[in-house]
Amino acid sequence: MKICIYGGSFNPPHLGHTAALRAVRAAIEPDVTLVIPDRIPPHKELTPGSPEPSESLLMTMLAFSSEPGVEVSDMELHRSGKSYTVDTVRELRDCNPDAELYLVVGTDMLTTFEQWHDYRALLAQVTLVALARTSDEHAEVERFSAYLRQTYGARVIALPAEPIPVTSTDVRRLLPQRRGSEYLAPDVYAHIIQQRLYGARPDLNWLREQAYPMLKPRRISHV
């Protein structure tokens, strides 16, 4: 059995995340796909004002709800302290001793992999699936993948650039400017606006779309 593990802060989850996971699943054809939001990322500080873990979990579930065969897991949200991937992998390995585990990583995570907690043990347990956001990054992914293979005997699959080159940082920057809705699933964007997350201000076109069903036909031309 193949298990694909896609972890991250998903702060917020955007269409680049879902597009990337589709590319991974098409390449490795996993039997089970787990999307796992982390509680406290070990490699970076959470942005001030980030949603509570329960809010992040809900947004992630909304983002991936239309992806068949994808399960969103809260296994890291119940742990105290930082969310170390090696702990998650060990937990999954204990429950699935014969499974092939595939861990999805982006360019930044791949090139700093030697800084991960207990990274050698992690490399022994998983096949890395490395994704670049741009064609320029893909060359770097290929180079570092080769380095990990030669140095540690790592199993690494390097995939082409993600179809939607956007980051959560980009989305957080755009939302207070009434922009960025095009990078989010409609349900995720609606939740962000309704809960006033990230200092978001509603996109005016989105507001019009929300208002139309509540207006009488003769009023729509004036909106």
What are these regions (language model features)?
Residues 1-223:
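Nucleotidyltransferase catalytic core that binds NTPs
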